UniProtKB/Swiss-Prot annotation:
Magnesium in keyword set: yes
Originating organism: Campylobacter jejuni subsp. jejuni serotype O:6 (strain 81116 / NCTC 11828)
Keyword presence, Endoplasmic reticulum: no
An example Gene Ontology molecular-function term: 2 iron, 2 sulfur cluster binding
EC primary class: lyase
Cofactor binding comment, as recorded: Binds 1 [2Fe-2S] cluster per subunit. This cluster acts as a Lewis acid cofactor.
Lineage: superkingdom: Bacteria
Lineage: Bacteria, Pseudomonadati, Campylobacterota, Epsilonproteobacteria, Campylobacterales
Record gene name: ilvD
UniProt family annotation: Belongs to the IlvD/Edd family.
Protein name: Dihydroxy-acid dehydratase
Subunit structure as annotated in this protein's UniProt entry: Homodimer.
Length: 558
């Protein structure tokens, strides 16, 4: 056992003495030691109940002859951190989470790992850390919350509240309606109820085979979710000493491809691109941002979920057959785009896992021949504005897929929010938000507040927004993020001026500023990088080490 390094032989008597102080008995030193990486925190609705979930898991581990050791990671709630300086810390928290998993698991030489994530950066951070450790690992998330319902009977989610801010600013809804939306949108614990970043990543864990069936869609705080926890705990005990189930044997090139196929079929959050690039790097798997358009071209978008379709939420997807039904439909209709021989954590191949899966409601999960789109729900655009690429969630577009407009430039998200409220962005404009990339922020803030303002003010179909920052999974509209190179590293987005003409063609995968080479060269000569004070030592360190979004915004030590 790996854990023999802390428990076997007379030289390890001091180690055992400390372990005895934690309650271990003689017989425990012959059992596998399993790390239970929890992410319990009171301020995140998807995490406040994870303490109880860890107790269920630890109890099941003990019943099955292993010794659990629980530890916690930090967590940031992107919705609560949104719209103020707190959002600077969201993406950097992914690195802290990864480092903490690696640190605890390797410092104590634990044999296996079960991770309990749920929201935002916590799932990818845990995946990155687990891949560094490379022991048998299972992920079992806290699960999605139920959708909210207004007094009028309309189904809503957190994204509805963000958009209601814009509607209230534009006097399109009353104060009473506004308060009703605020109080109704998040009715229970769990990750926010649509196909936002949390549920996207928990779904992709299922697609990669590192989580059990239902991980992405079974509601939080349900009996079914509790049974999933127990199954996961039993399984980690079965495989704790089996090297076939080391996480790098599960998250392979095939698994990463399967994740991106499901991402395209379900119109996942644009943040998944950022995270999967980072996860692939930790797994030693080749994934280039340029590869994603090929996958998208081969995968129909068959499940449209909030915020792209506000009548459908994760519990609806679960009732309709879940992620397995989506994968089964894609595999039966779209050739060999899915890698069906990929190994899953149960020991089954993906093909075996999907053998009984079927769509139970074609209004929720469509057949390929009735797809929302013949191509996937995400796209990577290239052009002089994004020579290294940028990301758009095509599933969330509500207007035209081809757009030409005049730039209205803002040098921060705060500046943009004030400008939008004051009416500086009009129909036909391209709202440009820059110096919000991984280095420029630093921290690559999400732009949910400005996109939701535009949507709520009725401009969602008539305005494009481009940024070197990123978006919440709750964003919809013609919103282009992750522009690379970013403004802070000399990207063209930093050279734009008000009134410059910008063209976006989603189906041609292009984004272009209509400027001559001579004009661009002249602007580069005149360009002076704005200086931004960064008081935080951690954010200054992050700023120095972080790569741009086209590489997953990972910390680059080379």
């Amino acid at each position: 056992m790996r854990s023999d390094a802390i428990k076997k032989g007379h030289l390890k008597a001091p180690n055992r003495s400390l372990l005895r102080a934690c309650g271990l008995k003689d017989e425990d030193f012959n059992k596998p030691f399993i790390g239970v990486a929890n992410s319990y925190i009171d301020i995140i609705p998807g995490h406040y109940f994870l303490n109880d979930y860890a107790k269920i898991i630890k109890d099941e581990i003990r019943k099955n002859g292993c010794v659990p050791f629980e530890f916690n990671t930090i967590g940031v709630d992107d919705g609560i951190a949104m719209g103020h300086e707190g959002m600077l810390y969201s993406l950097p928290s992914r690195e802290i989470i990864a480092n903490s998993i690696e640190t605890v698991m390797n410092a104590h030489q634990l044999d296996a790992l079960i991770c309990i994530p749920n929201c935002d950066k916590i799932t990818p951070g845990m995946l990155m850390g687990a891949l560094r450790v490379n022991v048998p690992t299972i992920f079992v998330s806290g699960g999605p919350m139920a959708s909210g319902v207004t007094k009028k009977g309309e189904k809503i989610s957190l994204s509805s509240v963000f958009e209601a801010v814009g509607a209230y600013e534009a006097k399109k809804i009353s104060e009473e309606e506004f308060k009703d939306i605020e109080c109704s949108a998040c009715p229970s614990g769990g990750s926010c109820s649509g196909m936002f970043t949390a549920n996207s990543m928990n779904t992709l864990c299922e697609a990669m085979g590192i989580a059990l069936e239902g991980n992405g869609t079974i509601l939080a705080l349900s009996k079914e979710r509790e049974e999933l926890l127990r199954k996961a705990a039993r399984r980690i005990c079965e495989i704790a000493l089996d090297e076939r189930f080391k996480i790098r044997n599960i998250i392979t090139q095939k698994a990463v491809r399967n994740a991106m196929v499901v991402d395209m079929a379900m119109g996942g959050s644009s943040n998944t691109v950022l995270h999967m690039l980072a996860i692939s790097r930790e797994a030693g798997v080749a994934l280039d941002i340029k590869d994603l358009n090929f996958i998208s071209s081969k995968v129909a978008h068959i499940a449209k979920i909030a915020p792209s379709l506000n009548s459908v939420y994760m519990d609806d997807v679960h009732k309709a057959g879940g992620v397995s039904a989506v994968m089964a439909e894609i595999s039966s209709r779209q050739g060999h785009i899915l890698e069906l021989d990929a190994l899953t954590i149960t020991g089954e191949s993906l093909k075996e896992r999907l053998k009984n899966a079927k769509i139970k409601d074609e209004n929720i999960i469509r057949k390929v021949d009735n797809a929302y789109s013949k191509v996937g729900g995400l796209a990577i655009l290239f052009g002089n504005l994004a020579e290294q690429g940028c990301v758009i969630k095509t599933a969330g577009i509500i207007g035209e897929r081809k757009f030409k407009g005049k730039a209205v430039c803002f040098n921060s998200q705060d500046e943009a929010i004030k400008g939008i409220i004051k009416g500086k962005v009009q129909k036909g404009n391209v709202c440009v938000i820059r110096y919000e990339g991984p280095k420029g922020g630093p921290g690559m803030q999400e732009m949910l507040s400005p996109t939701s303002l535009l949507m709520g003010m009725g401009l969602g179909a008539d305005v494009a927004l481009i940024t070197d920052g990123r978006f919440s999974g709750a964003t919809r509209g013609l919103s282009v993020g992750h522009i690379s190179p970013e403004a802070a590293e000399g990207g063209l987005i930093g050279l734009l001026k008000d009134g410059d003409e910008i063209e976006i063609d989603v189906d041609a995968y292009t984004i272009h500023a209509n400027l001559s080479e001579e004009e661009i060269t002249q602007r580069k000569k005149e360009f002076v990088l704005p200086q931004k004070e960064v008081p935080s030592r951690w954010l200054r360190m992050y700023q120095k080490l972080v790569s741009n979004a086209s590489k997953g915004a990972v910390l680059d030590m080379e």
